Amino acid sequence: MMGKSVWVFAALFPAVLAADIYVSPDGSDDAAGTIDAPLQSIQLAVDQATAGSTIYLRGGTYTPTSNIQITKSGTASAPYVLRAYEGESVIIDGEELPGTPADLDASLDNADRGILHIQDAEYWEFYDLELINGPYGVYARDASNNHYERITTRNNYETGFQLQGESSNNVVLYLDSYGNRDPRKNGESADGFACKEGSGEGNILRGARLWNNVDDGLDLWYAVNPVHPRISANTSREFKSAVTIEDTIAWGNGFNRWDFTPFEGDGNGFKLGGGDDTDIGPADHIITNCIAFSNAKDGFTDNSQPGNFVLTRNTAWDNTAVGFKFGTAVATLTGNIAASNGEAPTSLSDEQISDGNSWDGDEDWDDGSFVSVDVSLVQGERNADGTIEPSGFLLPADGEEIGATTDWSA
């Protein structure tokens, strides 16, 4: 009889096993981790947390000397949560971590990548965190079923947010990633958001802004000889599964703001593939309601990816080279706009399926074709829920319902 009573109690009151934990830059690791007696170390809070726990970070700047390792998993019904406390501003400054910056041509050990290093971990949720000056901001490897919302990754010494390895069903919502650069590679690989070297279905990037990064805004390329204990040094892999990208804006990427010599940055808004020709496999990416503007190279490019893409109502404006460049993928392009790009609106092979796009008609599209080309309309502070204010930015002046809109609730 007692055994049954214990089971009923555990079923009715599981939360007693998952206490919330509080952390503050002014806390103490000898404290209890309560709101009145917070810990100081985020890592200690992560280590003490159990599935279902919420770790609340009080406002201020945290300056860890080793990165935050997240290597355990919650469950769908009892996820771990790491978040800022009730609207307070939380900055995690990685300037004291290894690789900030690494020397030119130096390698960066897998374990040292990221202010948040998330590996072999599932069912975590992250909210309202700002990650700066780190060896990557967020580095998630072999990590699935995680949720990231209203994260800022800026001025890191590698890619702001990188998802890698066998990773699936991750949602990245309302990411701001900007000013990321890589002195160890002279600009070759620091992107705003990257999904590389692996596979996994169900990954979604939505509502991101990716700007002024040294390489690309978004990069789905893969790197040669990744540093990982389970991968041969002679192996190279791209991300070989579909990624869904929605309501995302990339601008100002690929310019040498750091005086790197020689400069190796690419400067695409959305680079949707690439890598070693002997190892490329098709990935059927879906890109909807995205904008690429004022990037140093192309707006949207397959970069040798052979998948079947679907691009619906996207806009490429004022990029230095080509708006939409697809030669190896077979892309179904519907309702997209290319205007005022430096070299050409498009560069499309005969295999592309194009219908109802700006270049399919007789009209010549230029700045005057839009309600507004005021870039400040998509810059600045977000709304509390992570959206940006809807505006007339790059909307067709004649009211035609093509191209991207900044009304992300539509």
Swiss-Prot record:
Task: Select a single GO molecular function from the record's annotations and give it.
Answer: carbon-oxygen lyase activity, acting on polysaccharides
Q: Give me the reactions it catalyses.
A: Eliminative cleavage of (1->4)-alpha-D-galacturonan to give oligosaccharides with 4-deoxy-alpha-D-galact-4-enuronosyl groups at their non-reducing ends
Composition bias, Polar residues: 342-351
**What sections of the sequence does the record tag as coiled-coil?**
none
Principal location:
secreted
Q: How is its activity regulated?
A: Inhibited by iron ions. Activated in presence of the surfactant polysorbate 20, while inhibited in the presence of Triton X-100 and sodium dodecyl sulfate. Inhibited in presence of the organic solvents methanol, ethanol, propan-2-ol and acetone.
Alphabetized, the UniProt keywords read: Calcium, Glycoprotein, Lyase, Metal-binding, Secreted, Signal
SUPFAM superfamilies named among the record's database cross-references: Pectin lyase-like
Q: What is its EC number?
A: 4.2.2.2
User: Can you supply one Gene Ontology CC term for this chain's record?
Assistant: extracellular region
Please give the cofactor(s) recorded in the UniProt entry for this protein.
Ca(2+)
User: Belongs to which family?
Assistant: Belongs to the polysaccharide lyase 9 family.
Q: What is this protein called?
A: Pectate lyase PEL9
Q: Which organism is it from?
A: Emericella nidulans (strain FGSC A4 / ATCC 38163 / CBS 112.46 / NRRL 194 / M139) (Aspergillus nidulans)
